[in-house]
């Protein structure tokens, strides 16, 4: 996108401020001095005021407006800064002003060049595979298979032998049934814990 504006053909402005030449301002940028002076050329504004006041309101038309009147024309002189790769910034000036022959034909040149190139080619390829293969994970391979513990031996008909008793004193004691019930519950709890692990 490029934007170009012709500064030399701006509309005219009528004001009493433009009687005197403005002082040139100097700014410093990266150690280099860049100057710019602007000069506004305007005739006596009092003569224009007398001219406008001497006419009746009915006689004032578009040709008497401030933008089209020769008395309010001005020009801007600016110093052009030239750059040199070896010498840096120099203060050689180039003066350019608007000619007075274009009074009444103020124009603002506004050119807009805009180029947009859009490549909207879109290619998409979607493939969906529904084949599902179940593979054993490393955790399954590393898991050890413990032998299942059966509790069929714990029954009411089981009779303690001499090796399970304390000197054979508990072979037919009254706590035999409670002991085997407790032993069965403990074994089931142990089996459940092993399965959970």
Curated annotation (Swiss-Prot):
A cellular component term, taken from the record's GO annotations: host cell cytoplasm
Location within or outside the cell: Host cytoplasm
Record field: compositional bias (Low complexity): 17-30
Binding positions for Mg(2+) per the UniProt entry: 92
Disordered: region residues: 17-37, 53-72, 130-157
Single GO BP term: viral genome replication
Phosphoprotein in keyword set: yes
InterPro entries: Rotavirus_A/C_NSP5 (IPR002512)
Cofactor requirement: Mg(2+)
Sorted UniProt keywords: Glycoprotein, Host cytoplasm, Magnesium, Metal-binding, Nucleotide-binding, Phosphoprotein, RNA-binding
Posttranslational mods: O-glycosylated. Hyperphosphorylated on serine residues, when in dimeric form. Phosphorylation by host CK1 is required for the hyperphosphorylation of NSP5 dimer.
Residues with the Phosphoserine modification: 67, 153, 155, 163, 165
MF terms (GO), sorted A to Z: ATP hydrolysis activity; magnesium ion binding; nucleotide binding; RNA binding
UniProt main location, coarse: host cell
Family: Belongs to the rotavirus NSP5 family.
Primary role: Plays an essential role in the viral genome replication. Participates, together with NSP2, in the formation of viral factories (viroplasms), which are large inclusions in the host cytoplasm where replication intermediates are assembled and viral RNA replication takes place. Orchestrates the recruitment of viroplasmic proteins such as capsid proteins to these factories. Participates in the selective exclusion of host proteins from stress granules (SG) and P bodies (PB). Also participates in the sequestration of these remodeled organelles in viral factories.
Assembly and interaction partners: Homodimer. Interacts with VP1. Interacts with VP2. Interacts with NSP2; this interaction leads to up-regulation of NSP5 hyperphosphorylation and formation of virus factories. Interacts with NSP6. Participates in the selective exclusion of host proteins from stress granules (SG) and P bodies (PB). Also participates in the sequestration of these remodeled organelles in viral factories.
Protein name, per record: Non-structural protein 5
Native source organism of the sequence: Rotavirus A (strain RVA/Human/Philippines/L26/1987/G12P1B[4])
């Amino acid at each position: 996108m490029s934007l170009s504006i012709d500064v030399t053909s701006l509309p005219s402005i009528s004001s009493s401020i433009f009687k005197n030449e403005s002082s040139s301002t100097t700014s410093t940028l990266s150690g280099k001095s860049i100057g710019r002076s602007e000069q506004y050329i305007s005739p006596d504004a009092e003569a224009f005021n007398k001219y406008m006041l001497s006419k009746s309101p009915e006689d004032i038309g578009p040709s008497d407006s401030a933008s089209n009147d020769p008395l309010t024309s001005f020009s801007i002189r600016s110093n052009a800064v030239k750059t040199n790769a070896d010498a840096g910034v120099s203060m050689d000036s180039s003066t350019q002003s608007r000619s007075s022959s274009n009074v009444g034909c103020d124009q603002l040149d506004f050119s807009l060049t805009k180029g947009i190139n859009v490549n909207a080619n879109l290619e998409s390829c979607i493939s969906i595979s529904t084949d599902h293969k179940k593979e054993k994970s490393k955790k399954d391979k590393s898991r050890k298979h413990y032998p299942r513990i059966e509790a069929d031996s714990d029954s009411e008909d089981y009779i303690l032998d001499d090796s399970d008793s304390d000197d054979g004193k508990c072979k037919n004691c009254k706590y035999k049934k409670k002991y085997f019930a407790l032993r069965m519950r403990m074994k089931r709890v142990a089996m459940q814990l092993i399965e959970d692990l």
